[in-house]
Amino acid sequence: MFDTITGIVKNTRDSSSVDALIEALGDILDGSPQGGEISDADAKRIQTEIDKFDQIEYEPNTMRKALQMMILKVSKADQLQANYQLTPDTIGDVVSYIASGLLENRQSLSILDPAMGTGNLLTTVINGLTNNINVEAHPYGLENDDAMFEIAASSFELQQVQADLYHEDAITDVMVPKVDLIVSDLPIGYYPIDENVANFETKAEKGHSFVHHLFLEMAANHLADGGVGIFLVPSAIFKSDEAKSLLKWMQGKVYLQGLLNLPKDLFANEAAQKSILILQKVGGDAKQAEPVMLGEFPSFKDAKGVQNFLTEIDEWRKNNMSK
């Protein structure tokens, strides 16, 4: 259905695939084709697809996965840049599993993704929290890219998830309340507007600053005392020349509770490898875990090995982390 309507719009408008998808999602949510310059025959075809959609009640996760496949298709067709890449479900499921364990005694919580992209990681974690610990989660999302924000907003609406979404740069001042949980597949690279980061402790002494360092600082500022942040970061985050300022900033503000390398076979090369970074905001009942959880996931193809590793994480959490 997504594919059919997107194809009709793309051919009619001679637009990019991602723009066609955005218009198609708008048509589905509006219940009829809204754009002009569509022939009666094409409008009828679109309406037929929308009517089929309206007659079926989809599970939110089914809807998310269908949209995920469509995003992958249009990203490939348009050869979109790396920041359009979706966080794989296997990683999203691991993040939600860890979050569920750390917050298992909560009945409700607030969750933020300050770099939500198309919203796939955030909705994956929300679904996981609901299924794993039956918690009521209220999501907040920030995204600066126009196209990704439009897709994310449509995705949440199609999944019938009530969320507060903001189309803005997370590094500038944002009107998001402090939350209990932050999850994010952080952008990697340099932040281009130096004057926006003048008050950041993690800014570079000279030149542009690492954007993932800035996002960690921003995230900590939006965590409630004792709140948890789970981030996808470069595995070498603490080995760069700029790591000294990051570690200095962390002292007294957040506890480094875990750093778990994702399987090497997920990435093109060692330099591209990512890890799951677990931070906890100082305050409340939070305390430094002893020891910090360090390790590397086995290949996700090794189901038994992954389950054993998750069991190790559970044991570490029960013995070392406050809830």
Label each region the model flagged.
Residues 208-265:
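Conserved Class I SAM-dependent methyltransferase catalytic core
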Residues 88-184, 189, 235:
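Conserved S-adenosyl-L-methionine
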Residues 238-239, 267-270, 286:
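Short glycine/serine/proline-enriched coil/turn segments at secondary-structure junctions
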Residues 87-92, 208-212:
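Phosphate/oxyanion-binding active-site loops and adjacent basic polyanion-contact surfaces
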Residues 77-90:
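Class I SAM-dependent methyltransferase Rossmann-like catalytic core
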Residues 1-76:
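A short N-terminal interaction module
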Residues 272-323:
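Flexible, glycine-/basic-rich loop-and-beta segments that form/coincide
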Residues 185-215, 236:
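Mobile active-site "lid"/loop adjacent to the S-adenosyl-L-methionine
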